[in-house]
């Protein structure tokens, strides 16, 4: 087995209190890795602390974790990528095990499933939201991950270089998960410790705002990845409403030969037309998506797997 080049990517914004310890922990766990801190418009001393700890600091001016991930995946070239947050909550000591799993099993992604060592590490709202989103992904895509929103992941080069990274914020973890599910990539999960933030470090994740954005991302990707099912559901609902409205009119017409409520009849007809249009739209878009998925699969296969 040849020596693999490893890049550790740590997105950061105002993590002066934690980034130094994070870099030091990953340096101890992966002494041969190159550690990058991608600063996202920090207003504190994050950059200087990261440099002092031995990290290479890059800057992404556009706010949002998704923008940082997009930039880092485009700029960094390595055989194996380790991504974690710079807030010292993830267990750096688990990284060698995750990398070994990726290489030996020839996987494209290993997810660090968070197991909190203290109740304060996982806020109740985040835990509930994670469970709901994980359940939605499982129902929509047929399979899912135990921790969809985990920010601790190890990737192969072909995953990183085939990932479009369209998200801008914290919904990027959801996009990463759906990318793996959509292309049926070989993946695995490893339970890792999840720690409380150091004093002075505060979470940038809003339970409701970012949860809503993640939910919209799932629905958008559902529409894009499964258009036949998405528009089929809409068409079915419209068709059922149309039939419910039309049945009393049909009964009255059969008895009297008259249509007593013309606007209602027009509404029923319009809804049925929309139902058919929705079905046909789903069929057309499904053909387009199959073509796009084939191109993405070919782009993925053009890159060498972990060795």
Stretch-by-stretch model annotation:
Residues 15-18, 42, 65, 91:
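Donor nucleotide-sugar binding loop of glycosyltransferases
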Residues 39-47, 88:
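A conserved acidic beta->alpha catalytic loop
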Residues 61-75, 92-170, 174, 195-212, ...:
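Acceptor/aglycone-binding surface of glycosyltransferases and processive sugar-polymer synthases
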Residues 81:
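Short aromatic/hydrophobic "clamp" motif used to bind/position activated sugar donors
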